Amino acid sequence: MFEEANDTLGFDLATLCFEGSHLELMQTMNTQPAILAVSVIAFEMGRQELGWEPCLMAGHSLGEYSALVCSGVFSFRDGLRIVRKRGMLMQDAVSAGLGAMAAVTHVPRDQLEQWCRLSATETAQVVIACYNSLNQHVIAGHQEAVGVVAELIQRKIPQAGVKYLNVSAPFHSPLMQAAADKLAADLGEHEIREGHCLVISNVTARPYGLQELASLLYRQMTHPVRWLDTMEFLFRQGVSRTVEVGPRQVLTQLMNDTYSSIQTYHFDNPQELEHLHSIFASGHYSRETIAVSIHEALMAAAIARNRNEDMTEYNNGVILPIQQIRELIEQIRQDRNLDMTSTLYRIRDLLQIVLTAKQLSSDEQMKIVRKLPTSKNVVTLIKG
């Protein structure tokens, strides 16, 4: 896949990742495609090795784009092009040294929000850019204003932690507005497809439909990453396991600290990979169990309220896909040589078409899609 990335970007991304200088890698126009490529490659390797398909995906910041590529919404090539452009726009939006980001620990959310409001001026802004957990946030904005908040924290709460991040721009802050406006135009040039599974938006902390994709990615540039709310959503949905893809284990640690009942795994840990492999290997459902689970999801989709009054769209987007799913259910029961993985992919895609055509909300879609047989209710997390 690195060859495809090199061809897409017009430079040797593999060499940049493994041999590039620290200065080159820290430029966000290089960092973003590098992280996306490594994350997608790791996901594909894990999928082939473990034979698992996630029921849902969530990515933190840039990781949301990696999740969209892994879920099939964007092609690998388009994903690389988008984040390369995104990185350039972010880098150009703020002059070097003007912006800053800092990770803050052990400061209550309300207190930090208040200090950001009090420290901001017409010419120097500072906001919370990431709500990572109850005890961890990231602030971003003009360097002067970020510095004022940092001094307040150190003076008022000595036991709190403040660590400046080595980034080239203040992401997820109002300073990215000009970059967001330009990115919006670029997003319209790329094909958006039905994904294999739902992806959670950083802006809403809920799965979104294709019609919301461009607007939410636009807003993600200037709005905070609601990761704490994302973890709460996963917990309330009954998620039992998460697998983190990509460099480091930041999201795994955040999940362990916040919802310890959810089992967490990371691709970098060989022992955890072996454990996952044994789980998935022993978790094969009987064909009849698979067929029954799909039928239950299909019935839920069939009786769900329809909000689409266009009969042509209803026929093409609801009636025909439901017929196709019924035919596939019979194939599952009868054809012992059937490729189960690709068949389940196809059924998930068809069910998503039905739910979208009926104009169901993201939450309604999520409840029905989760009825499909999955790899032990596993969610993939990808750090940006």
Model-derived features with residue positions:
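Acyltransferase
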Residues: Q159-Q253, S282-I332, L351-K383
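Alpha/beta catalytic cores of group-transfer enzymes, especially the acyltransferase/condensing modules
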Residues: D7-F11, G20-S21, Q48, S71-T222
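General structural feature for long, well-ordered alpha-helical segments within catalytic domains
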Residues: M1, I35-V38, A42, D78, ...
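Short low-complexity, flexible loop/linker segments enriched in glycine and/or proline
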Residues: A179, T258-S260, F280
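Active-site catalytic motif of lipid deacylating hydrolases and related acyltransferases
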Residues: M1-L36, I329-D335, Y345-S375, V379
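Short, flexible loop segments at boundaries between secondary-structure elements
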Residues: Q263-E288
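FabD-like malonyl-/acyl-CoA
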Residues: M1-Q114, T242-P270, D310
